[in-house]
Amino acid sequence: MSRPQKLAIGLIKGYQVAISPFFPSTCRFYPTCSEYAVQAIGKYGLMRGGLRAVRRVLRCHPFSPGGYDPA
């Protein structure tokens, strides 16, 4: 895993620990969008995995059916 990938994953993990607990869980998918981002970046690399994570976050809204959506 490259250094930029590790940095991006570290930032997401930091968000999960420091910021996310203060807000109610609203993600419509499993795994959550932030966990999906970690998995996608680890599996596909920073650029391709990051793009997949952005698309996933854009699909996560109140009108989305959600459900199981693995990376």
From Swiss-Prot:
GO terms for cellular component: plasma membrane. The keyword Transferase does not apply. Coiled coil: none annotated. Its main location: membrane. Keywords: Cell membrane, Membrane. It is a peripheral membrane protein. InterPro entries: Membr_insert_effic_factor_YidD. It is found in: Cell membrane. Could be involved in insertion of integral membrane proteins into the membrane. PANTHER family: MEMBRANE PROTEIN INSERTION EFFICIENCY FACTOR-RELATED (PTHR33383:SF1). NCBIfam families: membrane protein insertion efficiency factor YidD (TIGR00278). Belongs to the UPF0161 family. This is Putative membrane protein insertion efficiency factor. It comes from Desulforudis audaxviator (strain MP104C).
